[in-house]
Amino acid sequence: MRTLTAYNEDNFRQIEQYNGISVVRFSAPWCPPCQASEEMFSQFADRLDRDIQVGKVNVDQAPVLTTKYEIWGLPSVLIFHEGQLVKR
């Protein structure tokens, strides 16, 4: 099973500077839909090409990112290409 990198304000620059595709899931431990879909996201991540960065953000630990990317519903999956948000 693929390990999902936990991102926060300190290391999210890795996503913003990556020259490929990144898929990032924003969620929270208190969110029932987040918990219910966590395994499905892990299985999805396992099927992606290894050149695609995959990670997760706990919104409670990353309020600046949550605001910056306008995360209003959980879970939210954002797709970045060369550091730019292209799809949510």
For each feature predicted by the language model, list its residue ranges.
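N-terminal leader/targeting and pre-domain segments
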Residues: 1-22
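Conserved SAM-binding loop
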Residues: 23, 33, 54
